[in-house]
A protein has these predicted regions:
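PLP-dependent amino-acid enzyme catalytic core
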Residues: 1-407
């Protein structure tokens, strides 16, 4: 395992390629959890992610003979771009194997950094196997996305930057996927300040670290289901698990709904965009069992496409009670839409969408279903709409988040 001086040497090594992402104080997230919250915005890092730190550190430490052989990696996202840029800066050939259906924007970004891209397989595991075949055939050096001491060492430089800027930080919240970033940050932070608390945050639908800790060894998850695709890892690494067991104080999980809510707050209040995996620590703030502490949330990346941004904002509005969707059964006769409009106006609700469906009910000749989506300003406003309809003799059915968000 790495020592403090190893992380300090890595920090010097990375000065030629990375930027120091300055901490941002967050009033809104502080209010949400009752702590003094700072954001470490690695979404503003070169390539849009922390991954370049570990990739560059690994490749820069190769021997001249290894550099001459070239490097290879398998990735559908941030690791690909980190390896590609690091290799380009160091004048080394890089080959990246990506699943065939990787979004074109990520493929092109990786190519622009100078790497040769090989598209293979439907999922990451198939791309990984292809990368292993090419490594054996061509003698490339494989750069693992997380289960590698040199990669972990590079990611740990984030902790040194945080503690240089905020030496009295009490808690660090770090995303967990394969475990590389939490391993590096936890080790470097604890070696620098043994009293600091490090908490890993992983998706409920991809809790590979918790599963490994319970079994005391890495185990594959039966299913991975999360919107945090960058941390949707079926099995954590062996090396990273040892770091987690030694240095990480706690692992917590967050739901997709909590990610949606955190995304909206980050965009709305800080004018920052981050990928779903990157906001895991922000979503985990409400689950802290402490108050009044200085907490740093590591926002690890910002590579997210425009359509996903739009979807996350809309879903965040639903979760925060800013959009309310409900259904109401109406007599199938003229004038009912007017009555509904009057009740919505009385409740100061601005209509976004109406769906008047005569065929939803079996007895369509007697009543029809109207589904309504309105803008609201929170739960109190939603309740006032419900009460307004009730006093006028209408019973409305509130659609729950899963019904709305699955559409």
């Amino acid at each position: 395992m790495r020592k403090l001086y190893d992380f300090m040497e890595a920090r010097e090594r990375l000065t030629t390629i990375t930027v120091k992402t300055k901490l941002l104080h967050s009033d809104v997230f502080s209010d949400e959890c009752g702590n003094d919250v700072y954001i470490k915005p690695e979404n503003l890092q070169i390539t849009g992610s922390f991954k370049v730190r570990g990739a560059y550190n690994k490749i820069a430490k190769l021997t001249e003979e290894e550099k001459a052989r070239g490097v290879i990696a398998a990735s559908a996202g941030n690791h690909a771009q980190g390896v590609a840029l690091a290799a380009k800066r160091l004048g080394i050939k890089a080959t990246i194997v990506m699943p065939k259906h990787t979004p074109l924007i990520k493929v092109n970004a990786t190519k622009q950094y100078g790497a040769e891209v090989v598209l293979h397989g439907e999922i990451y595991d198939e791309a990984y196997q292809k990368a292993m075949e090419l490594q054996q055939e061509n003698g490339y050096v494989f750069v693992h996305p997380f289960d590698d001491e040199d990669v972990i060492e590079g990611q740990g430089t984030i902790a040194l930057e945080v503690l240089a800027e905020l030496p009295d930080a009490d808690v660090l919240l770090v995303p967990v996927g394969g475990g590389g970033i939490v391993s590096g940050i936890a080790a470097a932070a604890k070696l620098k300040n043994p009293r600091i608390k490090v908490i890993g945050v992983e998706p409920e639908g991809a809790a590979s670290a918790l599963a490994a800790l319970k079994a005391d060894h890495p185990v594959p998850l039966d299913e991975v289901a999360t919107i945090a695709d960058g941390t949707a890892v079926r099995q954590i690494g062996e090396t990273t698990l040892e770091y987690i067991k030694k240095y990480v104080d706690e692992i917590i999980t967050v739901s997709d709904y909590e990610l949606m809510e955190a995304f909206l707050l980050l965009v709305e209040k800080h004018k920052l965009v981050a990928e779903n995996s990157g906001i895991l620590p922000l979503a985990g703030l409400k689950k802290l069992d402490c108050k009044g502490k200085k907490v740093v949330a590591i926002v690890s990346g910002g590579n997210i496409d425009v359509l996903t941004i739009s979807s996350m904002i809309n879903k965040g509005l639903v979760v925060r009670g800013r959009i309310f969707t409900f259904s109401v059964n109406l007599p199938d006769k003229p004038g009912q839409l007017v009555a509904v409009s009057q009740m919505l106006a009385e409740a100061d609700a601005n209509v976004i969408k109406l769906d008047h469906n005569q065929f939803k009910n079996l007895d369509r000749f007697h009543e029809v279903e109207l589904q309504v989506t309105v803008e609201t300003n929170g739960e109190e406003h939603i309740q006032s709409i419900i009460d307004t309809f009730k006093k006028n003799g209408y019973t409305i059915k509130r659609l729950n988040s899963s019904e709305i968000l699955s559409e």
